[in-house]
Amino acid sequence: MQEFDKSISFDGRDIRLKMGTLAPQAGGSVLIQSGDTAVLVTATRAKGRDGIDFLPLTVDYEGRLYAAGRIPGGFLRREGRPPEKATLISRLIDRPLRPLFPHWLRDELQIVATTLSMDEEVPPDVLAVTGASVAVILAQIPFKGPMAAVRVGLVGDDFIINPTYREVHNGDLDLVVAGTPAGIVMVEAGANQLPEQDIIEAIDFGYEAVQDLINAQRELMTDLGITLATSEPPPVNTAVEEFIANRASKKIITVLGQFDLGKDGRDAALDEIKATEVETAIAELPETDPVKQSVEEDPKLVGNLYKALTKKLMRKQIVDDGVRVDGRKLEQVRPISCEVGFLPRRVHGSGLFNRGLTQVLSLATLGSPGDAQDLADDLHPEDEKRYLHHYNFPPYSVGEARPMRSPGRREIGHGALAERAIIPVLPPQEDFPYVVRVVSEVLSSNGSTSMGSVCGSTLALMDAGVPIKKPVSGAAMGLIKEGDEIRILTDIQGIEDFLGDMDFKVAGTDSGITALQMDMKIDGLSMEVVSKAIMQALPARLHILDKMLATIREPRPELSPFAPRLLTLKIEPEHIGMVIGPGGKTIKGITEQTSCKIDIADDGTVTIASSEGERAERARQMIYNMTRKLNEGEVYLGRVTRIIPIGAFVEVLPGKEGMIHISQLTEGRVGKVEDEVGVGDEVIVKVREIDSKGRLNLTRLGIHPDEAAEARRNASRG
């Protein structure tokens, strides 16, 4: 491809597309740049593997530290396993892209987005999403595009397109909208308890901006003389399809109408129909029968067509009758139960949340500021995280037996969504300096486990005594679209997620939304439908919230006795080195003496963590004494450190020494200093003078017995 540049004037900032220069062997490649942020996005297509029945699409985002002029840490000094942020951006690219490929496509597809340069103004993620659309178009991969994405922020009362990092951080909204000419295909947002109507307006505002980027891609296609690639669906084997429908339809409809079967009973009944009414009947056909020959040629044909028939009949039941497979109405939430304090208090907080067959146990742990997650080797400009949510999805939660692995993209994505939902209600760090980690263990899954994790997290935090501003609940909405008929489902379960067209998760408080995430399986939704789904989620969220508040109305007033106690004090930044000491000697000594964990921030904030308040207070007093300003007339219990002919040096506080002149040791004449004191002796001294160089002149004279007693008490406290 020849080199080609195109600049798009977009909302006051140019976006530049550069093609034909980099990655010439990739199917399609584009360097998309805004400001000093530049992302190379490639799309490559290869022959698919035999026998697969899914689209093998891989999306990888790579954030290189050289893009920000930095060298990685660690021994190897190179990037290692992608950080969580990179995984989330990979998912952000994948989610709006995947539904736009033909569902019958079986070629290997790989999208790779690599940030080559990055400034502190323009995030690379939405550039990568739009760049992926351009790369796919250039690679001539069948695709219902063009597709583009923008970020929407809220500064004051005004929505803005593609805000800077600072504007997002200081604002109340971080929303990404992706769309095609057919409608909206993906929404993801974190918000500071914004009302539903504000969120709807923000999505609409973003989708209008998306149209500009879609039109720019159309212009690019015209300039390059290319069109969107298309792919015809493979022919359906109508003979086998009709055979299965004739044998199984009525029995499937009967099973779908038996609402008391439950998930396992329904699955077993459907499997039984498939085995007895379809597979057994095909096995009994003569070898010359076209149906039997087709099935022998494609062993997966029966399974795929039977699944398609079940999907069709379930969707028809919802559209025609307004009844779901478990008998619920479209807007009805499954039965809910909650429990807090489920585990002993050695676990700082625990919450068990049940919704239908979905069960999530969330566990909260409180730590000191030093437990914050260090993001120093992440390309993005966050330094650390003080609230962490981790989501685990073991195989037994769906009745499977398979090897346990480290968290995959799904687990990371679900954990991040639940984390995002809770962050707006956390107390300010100055009021509650703890680092908080919540782990959500999915013990049983039948849909909406990420929103179950939001509810479980809220329960666990309140049980742990974390003073959250408001409790957060969440619900997952689904969609069935058959022609012009649209049905929105509240609180979808697993089969409705699998056979439906949308998974729209909404979390928030009774004041507004804190997080949402919408994924589509079709090529776009209108604003009208998106708006209706958001509004339909509100009564569901409030209903769930009522159930949670019936279990625990407010955070516990006391922390678990096993949670660390934190004390803080502020020292002058220039004293930090003194507290740490050479090679960390001083602070290690305090830690060993008090069994406390001590963290010192760059601004001089010292946080002391201990399971025992007395130990923490002793450490605080030791650091305070080291860094406090001494005044003339104050009395201390000190220790003699060395003797010289004219006097003795006494350490009155850690790191603070003064001298007692021989004439100040006692009343009357002293022949030798050693006659009065020796090295290691404890002595009561008063600060007689602080000279112009800050040196302490001490005395043992004129000290009242009460002053001496107070000095001894202070010394005993550290």
From Swiss-Prot:
This is Polyribonucleotide nucleotidyltransferase. Belongs to the polyribonucleotide nucleotidyltransferase family. Gene3D superfamilies: GHMP Kinase, N-terminal domain, K Homology domain, type 1, Nucleic acid-binding proteins. It catalyses: RNA(n+1) + phosphate = RNA(n) + a ribonucleoside 5'-diphosphate. It comes from Synechocystis sp. (strain ATCC 27184 / PCC 6803 / Kazusa). It is found in: Cytoplasm. It is an enzyme of class 2 (transferase). SMART domains: KH, S1. The lineage of its organism: Bacteria, Bacillati, Cyanobacteriota, Cyanophyceae, Synechococcales. InterPro entries: ExoRNase_PH_dom1, ExoRNase_PH_dom2, ExoRNase_PH_dom2_sf, KH_dom, KH_dom_type_1, KH_dom_type_1_sf, NA-bd_OB-fold, PNPase. Interacts with RNase E (rne). The gene is pnp. The keyword Metal-binding applies. One of its GO terms (molecular function) is 3'-5'-RNA exonuclease activity. Residues 564-623 form the KH domain. It comes from the Bacteria. Its cofactor is Mg(2+). NCBIfam families: polynuc_phos, PRK11824.1. Keywords: Cytoplasm, Magnesium, Metal-binding, Nucleotidyltransferase, RNA-binding, Transferase. Disruption phenotype: Essential, it cannot be deleted. Its EC number is 2.7.7.8.
